[in-house]
């Protein structure tokens, strides 16, 4: 967090494009700051529904699902798969089986299919945990994200997020903390 904030202090123009800081705030429990970071990122990239999902998740922690859904960012342009479908999921318009059916029906090339599934498993897992309270199902999807070939072999920032979120959900499940 401090390194990201220092980057922005040294180069203020970086603030609007700094989605990583928003995710950092989210995992530190600074949900208002996280939501704000995702709001200003939208000025930088008005297509990226992944950003809108993080804003939604931050707002859920502050004010609940109903209010967060009422405040979802409106997108006008298309986005990369699976984000339009994931956004529909977070809006409450589809369920995970429909999302996965759409991915499989798209018949993407193998490597791209793996990439799309990684993102779907990650966000469906978080959705099931956060919105539906289905911890066991969430854990299974997060495990699939972590073991996904694309995620494992690229080691991207989002794969690290998946790994950390999966570890957190496992920890809570083991010691049976209320969620």
Q: Residue spans of the language-model regions?
A:
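Residue-level detector of the short coil/turn that links helix A to helix B
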Residues: 2, 29, 63, 132-133
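Canonical positions in the second alpha-helix
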Residues: 6-7, 40-41, 75, 145
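Structural marker of alpha-solenoid helical repeat scaffolds
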Residues: 10, 44-45, 78, 113, ...
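Register position in tetratricopeptide repeats
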Residues: 27, 61, 130-131, 165-168, ...
């Amino acid at each position: 967090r401090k390194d990201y904030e220092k980057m922005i202090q040294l180069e203020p123009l970086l603030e609007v494009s700094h989605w990583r800081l928003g995710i950092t705030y989210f995992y530190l429990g600074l949900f208002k700051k996280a939501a704000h970071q995702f709001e200003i990122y939208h000025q930088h990239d008005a297509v990226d529904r992944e950003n809108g999902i993080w804003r939604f998740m931050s707002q859920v922690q502050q004010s609940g699902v109903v209010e967060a859904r009422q405040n979802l960012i409106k997108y006008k342009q298309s986005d990369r798969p699976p984000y339009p479908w994931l956004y529909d999921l977070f809006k409450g318009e589809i369920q995970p089986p429909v999302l996965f059916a759409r991915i499989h029906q798209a018949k993407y090339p193998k490597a791209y299919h793996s990439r799309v599934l990684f993102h779907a498993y990650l966000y469906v897992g978080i959705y099931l945990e956060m919105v539906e309270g289905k911890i066991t199902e969430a854990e299974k999807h997060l495990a699939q994200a972590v073991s996904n070939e694309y995620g494992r072999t690229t080691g991207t920032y989002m794969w690290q997020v998946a790994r950390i979120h999966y570890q957190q959900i496992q920890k809570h499940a083991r010691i049976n903390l209320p969620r």
